[in-house]
């Protein structure tokens, strides 16, 4: 069997952290806490060792993209419009995609003070629950067929070509698209697109979301760790929903601790694990960079495409 990482440069954490530059911006513990997702663990040292070198790498790709746009303009003998630098971030549920995305957004804003840095999640392109019910696929929520891929691809195409667009907003508290609420994306310099499906496209195999990406990241971890983090997150969500009857997870607070754990394990085994093994993990080698997390959520290995 061909080694999946044959086209990647594998870099240890100790080697990677040497790419940090002393004059780079950093963050305070309070700022990190404000962007941290449930049960995710990140500290200032992780930012310095992993994410500041990553910002250096993104700067290289960004500069190369600008140079290519300029050179194309000379070749075509016409001015080329500025296009947003789009970063795709993928990985399993509970692996820390959202924290990584918000962290990169903050660091990019510090690194490029005059730039507009927006972030979207592909959750907003899930079909509303009623549509999933009508299609008979509510139990497949999060799988490729549960996303409005034409809408998602049209969004990327519009933004890449300088247009403004309003997109749906998803709420984990109500477990559905929020009726009447949209997020406006208007000519950002950087756009971070985060979701489990950013390297997939089940509708039109001739066009992938990744065709619009200038840089892409896959957050990786051993399955046993992802399962543990998922179960921990589920318990945290229940605690947060205990006094909020409008929260989707409130209904599960009526269960005993053992019943709730059993439900979470069943959901992991029948939905999230299947989705990871069949649809998410097989796309990771489409990423430009793979960040592997160890037991303690720390990045311990980096794979960079050659």
Curated annotation (Swiss-Prot):
Can you list the GO cellular component terms from the UniProt entry?
A: cytoplasm
Could you provide one GO biological process annotation from this protein's UniProt record?
coenzyme A biosynthetic process
Q: Which InterPro entries match?
A: P-loop_NTPase, PanK, PRK/URK
Q: Which UniProt keywords apply?
A: ATP-binding, Coenzyme A biosynthesis, Cytoplasm, Kinase, Nucleotide-binding, Transferase
Q: Which reaction does it catalyse?
A: (R)-pantothenate + ATP = (R)-4'-phosphopantothenate + ADP + H(+)
Record: residues binding ATP: 91-98
Q: Where in the cell is it found?
A: Cytoplasm
Q: Which Gene3D superfamilies match?
A: P-loop containing nucleotide triphosphate hydrolases
Q: In which pathway does it act?
A: Cofactor biosynthesis; coenzyme A biosynthesis; CoA from (R)-pantothenate: step 1/5
Against Pfam families, the record matches this protein to: PRK
Q: What is its EC number?
A: 2.7.1.33
Q: Name one GO molecular function term.
A: pantothenate kinase activity
**Superkingdom per UniProt:** Bacteria
By sequence similarity, the record places it as follows:
Belongs to the prokaryotic pantothenate kinase family.
Q: Do you know which PANTHER family this protein is assigned to?
A: URIDINE KINASE
Instruction: Return the protein name.
Output: Pantothenate kinase
What is the species of this protein?
A: Streptococcus thermophilus (strain ATCC BAA-491 / LMD-9)
Gene assigned in the entry: coaA
